[in-house]
């Protein structure tokens, strides 16, 4: 049986991978959005693990709120990405300063 430490290590590894993904790739908007989603997944893994091992369902309920916010964040991020690609024909983060007014 897996202990709480196993799930926390998994969450920490996922979080570290997402941090590395953001810092190593600062140009592509899609990769940055995927890394942020992975970061939220790592946090949700820790919430579910603590909720299960403490016998409380509040952590699992909170995961649904985090998933809702993550879905809204992904939708807004992809909308910005589509706007960027339509106006500039690129998805580089460095070109975001050209989207004015």
Swiss-Prot record:
Just give the chief location class: membrane
EC primary class: translocase
Annotated membrane-spanning segments are: 4-24, 30-50, 61-81
What highest taxon heads this organism's lineage?
Bacteria
Q: Which InterPro entries match?
A: NADH_UbQ_OxRdtase_chain4L/K, NUOK/Mnh_C1-like
One example GO MF annotation: quinone binding
**What kind of membrane protein is this, topologically?**
Multi-pass membrane protein
Q: Does the keyword Translocase apply?
A: yes
* Known EC number: 7.1.1.-
Checking Gene3D superfamilies in the record gives: 1.10.287.3510
Write out the catalysed reaction: a quinone + NADH + 5 H(+)(in) = a quinol + NAD(+) + 4 H(+)(out)
Entry's Gene Ontology cellular component terms: NADH dehydrogenase complex; plasma membrane
Ordered alphabetically, the record's keywords are: Cell inner membrane, Cell membrane, Membrane, NAD, Quinone, Translocase, Transmembrane, Transmembrane helix, Transport, Ubiquinone
Assembly information from the UniProt record? NDH-1 is composed of 14 different subunits. Subunits NuoA, H, J, K, L, M, N constitute the membrane sector of the complex.
Role summary: NDH-1 shuttles electrons from NADH, via FMN and iron-sulfur (Fe-S) centers, to quinones in the respiratory chain. The immediate electron acceptor for the enzyme in this species is believed to be ubiquinone. Couples the redox reaction to proton translocation (for every two electrons transferred, four hydrogen ions are translocated across the cytoplasmic membrane), and thus conserves the redox energy in a proton gradient.
Instruction: Tell me the protein family, please.
Output: Belongs to the complex I subunit 4L family.
Q: Which NCBIfam families match?
A: PRK05715.1-2, PRK05715.1-3, PRK05715.1-5
Question: PANTHER family given for it?
Answer: NADH DEHYDROGENASE SUBUNIT 4L-RELATED, NADH-UBIQUINONE OXIDOREDUCTASE SUBUNIT ND4L
User: What is the protein named?
Assistant: NADH-quinone oxidoreductase subunit K
Source organism of this protein record: Paraburkholderia phymatum (strain DSM 17167 / CIP 108236 / LMG 21445 / STM815) (Burkholderia phymatum)
């Amino acid at each position: 049986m897996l202990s709480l430490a196993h799930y926390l290590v998994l969450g920490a590894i996922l979080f570290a991978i997402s941090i590395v993904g953001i810092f190593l790739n600062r140009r592509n908007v899609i990769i940055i959005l995927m890394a942020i989603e992975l970061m939220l997944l790592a946090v949700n893994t820790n919430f579910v693990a603590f909720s299960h091992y403490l016998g409380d369902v509040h952590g699992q309920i909170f995961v649904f709120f985090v998933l809702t916010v993550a879905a809204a964040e992904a939708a807004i991020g992809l909308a910005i990405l589509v706007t960027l690609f339509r106006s500039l024909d690129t998805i580089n983060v460095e070109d975001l300063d050209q989207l004015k007014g």
